[in-house]
């Protein structure tokens, strides 16, 4: 079925969702004052790298600009300079702003506005990498070979200056017209080679239609539900964040920059991890592929099979949706105080608990993507596009609840509840009394299985709490200094805050989509729609169908055949309960 957009709008009030989930838009006055008066604690010790012509790539209108990039093709491969807003330099770790950020966990994007991690005066002004402004940054330098594999990498504190603010659509248009900004002229080739490297590692990338709620400019208070376009430029750009997160994880696990000898001291890390999928889940997916007539050679990985599918075939939607079930169990793993061993073992600790153990939040599938896209965005299947450095974690099966933050979670932002952040109940846990775990962490369970390597969140500190802490560890390791005590004290509370906020973000995001779907369809009960059956009924749950016009996904009564295009009838759409249902046959 052709996945297309159509303008369908209705009046939707998201205030009830804010109230239901306790999202307070106002920032405490004391914390706001701290943000207003924030100064760069490392102003006198920064490298001046304002000579690098950085650019930012973000959704139109975004002001919380975490990342600025410059990439060049060299005689030996590629050199990536990636500047990340240095939030740790402008927040007093013992002050009111740090305490409030610890409670919030991450920024919440709803269709009608944000609930920010930090006050806008900081996140959208003084700490944001806005064009033509000198800004403090954590500057990553990553030297890659011709295959875009990292050879040397490190991070330092620097002053940077962005030259231009770009968006994904314009970057794609410029790439198509062969007129890319010089600072990112090498991005397409670099991105393609990184994507290929990911497939070689066993990475899994999903391409599912992403529902977005956007404002209807022609009708006050009305909102539209559309399929969010995703460009190749999105994929290329997220590869930079993904690469940076992989380098960050290696620095934390090795205890040093890439060109230094691995440390034999304490291993301190905040990793984004995901366990490998069960073989039974892969076997089930192979049976589904066979039933749909999709050729899947026995020696071909899941990622390569998915990458080779026809994006417009109904079977692709079914398999991509089922693949979300392979990407479950994403969470944060804290290592603190372990002595790194030759086999990669080290002590881990659980979030919010004084006893040891790896942090693993059961939040389902995750992928990276920018949570600030043009509206509340939910990928069908609860998963954003995989691939990049920060995919927002998404969870669940088709139509299921999404989670936050992604393989990484990649960093495309949305202006409304889209793959984004959270307000949580506050920090929990602490370092006091922590004991080594009796189950040493292994190389396998320190990995992010969707990425095929260890990974960390370090590229979105204006919007996600974990990134500030992981970045500080990397800065200390590369400088050869001790990791600050406030960072070590905050690792477990931060992981716990992220776990809570991820869960809440998914619920809020799903609620915004459900409310919009049910409101748009409320006057169309009994109407007949063309649909693709993305999941058949199994006796314990109904079938699930995707409607392209308007783009909705919902349960279907009856037994429609999986992977087929059928006609279904809308039998229920209730904005009060935020539920919709279809029926088959009509």
Regions found by a protein language model. Give the residues of each.
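Electropositive polyanion-binding surfaces
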Residues: 2-352, 391-392, 398, 407, ...
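Long, intrinsically disordered low-complexity tandem-repeat segments
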Residues: 350-410, 416, 421-425
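Short, compositionally biased
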Residues: 582-586
